[in-house]
Every structure is written in structure tokens, then in C-alpha cells.
């Protein structure tokens, strides 16, 4: 039976940051994930924003961790392999009566210590973003806000943790746990068992179920659905900064988000879901997204839409729940991590490390710890000279499999050899299947490469593991 100092349950953005942080110390750490790959829960379908630090008051844990986490992304971007850009955030007021809320956000941002935050006139808003509705009356500008690709961020964090000694076990769905002396004995639904002195519950939507399995606190995580539209990179409606409406008590509203890869996201909605596996989109909600987004950027066209999708966030109260359990020994709760969880996640890693130390975990720094990962060359980012060099080193760079996103066979092979053996895993690692045709032309090529590289037969290829087979029947 495998034995560890720390077991982290859940390989989303929080679990990945915690794993990487603990990899800096002389510890045996395992990261447990119920899905076939990491980043397939909440982390795969969110807005990809580094928030500005003005939406929540500094008295809340989420605001403090958001502010701390936001400052860490420049260093993380240098060390890891994910796209990131500090493009700034605008909050647009379309009516005079919304300016009072803008002033409150500004004062809260100043109190929180947000650098460079600015209340803006109509003229200043249109100078910062010419694509805004000309009826805008004013707003807020936070230059420190940014955008990133969330799944690539998680993949890179996990790669770094692995490189520094963390074990990663996918398809390990926790079924039960019991205390055995100084250890937790954790059994998966498939019957595999690991032992760990300390456990971190970062299971996202399922954190309540995991907490109950360990005899810790009883609470309920309510799934809250956010639906999005994705616009093609050719849209004329792409802003240069993230655009928020004035927030309501329910949510931060429908955003217009320029992505780091050149497309545009509009959304999300915020509706209650009954099922933690309900990722369906609805026509009513998508029409609401289009209407709301056009209020801020009128040039948005339905003709630019290439896909829609939904994500679920873990709703629990008005703040994060991150604490040592008062009921279960050596058990840390990391629950209720909704917006701005992505922004706060690097700081959550630091915070959980401190909680584990407080609980008795001995931390000795690892002299050999290396923060850097290899940055995979991307064909779409290469100039002709660089691409010629890449092709000379690996001819597979000359075979463009996904023409919409200019993804080469070499990149797909690297994704597979890094452990991403589903169509979704390859999509999130490389962006193949993410373009205008949504995989219409490249999926069959990717399936052939998967079969060649893994030895799987055609009927073993899945979209995201489990019962998501792509091809069925006989050929």
C-alpha cells in the first residue's frame, strides 16, 4: 500500500497550486483526481480572468487571497508554460444611477490597496476601449487585471509538481476513508488504497461529499451554472480589455472577455443547477448573454459565435471555506472556491501550506526544487524562420493537423506523451478542435495519432473518459 505525507483530493486549479507549493519541500505528496485527466472540472470552463481586487472587501478571505494571488502571476508566467496578459479590466456604467456603485467599487479598491485603480469619465472609458457602447456614462479601470488560459495553467502547475516529485493518480474517485493511527486510509471506488498523514480536500463541487466521507464538517456545495458563448478570432467586436457591467448582488454579470488566444468569450450567466453534472446550455440563457453583451459592445454578432458551453462553480456562502477541520484530524478544507478562485489559487497554495504547518506537518525546503518547466514550442506562435528550425528538429512540426488553430502533429504527440490521452485533454493542451470548425476537420486525424501513439483501438478513444466514446459499432 502506497504511503504519503500529504494526499490532495481534486486536481483543479486549487489542488494543482497546492501540489506545486508542497513540491518545494521534502515531502511525499500524491494528487488524487477522479477524472481521467486534470483540469476537467470547474477549472476547464471559467472566464480565465485575473481579477482586479475591487469586487470584494478586504475583510473577506477571498479578497485577501485574490489580491495576493493576482500579484503572483507574472512570476508564474515566467516559470511555467501558459499564456497570460495583463490587459486591464473595465467596469462600464451605462446609466447615471450606476455611477454610485462605480464609486463604491473604486473606494473599496483603494481600501484594498489595488494599484492604479481609476474612476473614469465617458471620454476616458471610450479612450481605453473604443468598442464600448457610446452611451457609456463612465466607469472604473483596473490596469492590474488580466487574462490567461485556465486549463494550460493547471496542466503546467501539475507538470511542475510532477517534475519535483509529486505523484498524480487520475481515475481515483474517493469512496471511503478511515483513520488508522497517524494515517488516513483512502480507498477509491475501484478498490485502490493509499495512506496519508494529512489530507487536503480541494474537490470542488464534490468537497461536501469528501468532507462527509472523512467524518469532517457537514455542509452543502450548491452547483451554480455559468453559460458562455465563444466568438471567432475574426470578430470585429474584440475589445482590448476585459469589460464588466456594474455588478448585482447575485453575480458580477455578463462579461466581454478578450482571450489570450485571440477569441472572445461572452458570459457567464449565474443560475442554480440541480445536478453537479449538468453542463447543458439553454437557448434562453444564451439569448440573455447576447443581449447583455451587446449592451456593452454593440458590434457583437451572432454570426461570430463558434460554440457555446457551460461550467459549474461551487457555491457556498459569501466567502471561501479554507481551514483546518475541527472534526477530523490532519484534514484541511478548501471548499466553496468560486469567483475569484482562479485569481486566488496561487495564494491558496501558500495559505494551505501554512495551515498544514500549523497542523503539525514538518516542512523542510528541497534544495533541488526547480520552478521551471519546459515550454512547448507552438507552431502558430512561430515566425517562418523559427518554424523551419522546428521542422528540421522534428518533421512533425510541418504537419498542421488543426488548421483553424494551426496546431501541428508534433504538439499533439507531445500532449499524448504528457499523459493527455482523450480528445478533450488534447484540446485543452494544444487548442486543436477549438477553432471555427470545432474539430470538424481535425478530429479524425487526432484519433489516428492517438491510436498510433497509445496502441488504443478506435473504439477505446473517448472525449473525456468514462462513457464518452467517440466511435461505436462496427467498421
What is each residue range found by the language model?
Residues 5-31:
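N-terminal Rossmann-like FAD-binding beta1-loop-alpha1 element of flavoenzymes
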Residues 17, 177-182, 186-267, 271-280, ...:
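Flavin-dependent oxidoreductases
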Residues 24-44:
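Glycine-rich FAD pyrophosphate-binding loop
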Residues 48-128, 253-254:
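Dinucleotide-binding Rossmann-like beta1-alpha1 core, especially the glycine-rich loop
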Residues 64-67, 92-101, 140-159, 279-284, ...:
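Short beta-strand to alpha-helix junction loop
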Residues 140-198:
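Helical element adjacent to the flavin cofactor pocket in flavoenzyme catalytic cores
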Residues 251, 260-261, 272, 277-400, ...:
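C-terminal catalytic lobe of FAD-dependent flavoproteins
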Residues 277, 408-419, 441-458:
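Iron-sulfur (Fe-S) cluster-binding segments and ferredoxin-like electron-carrier domains
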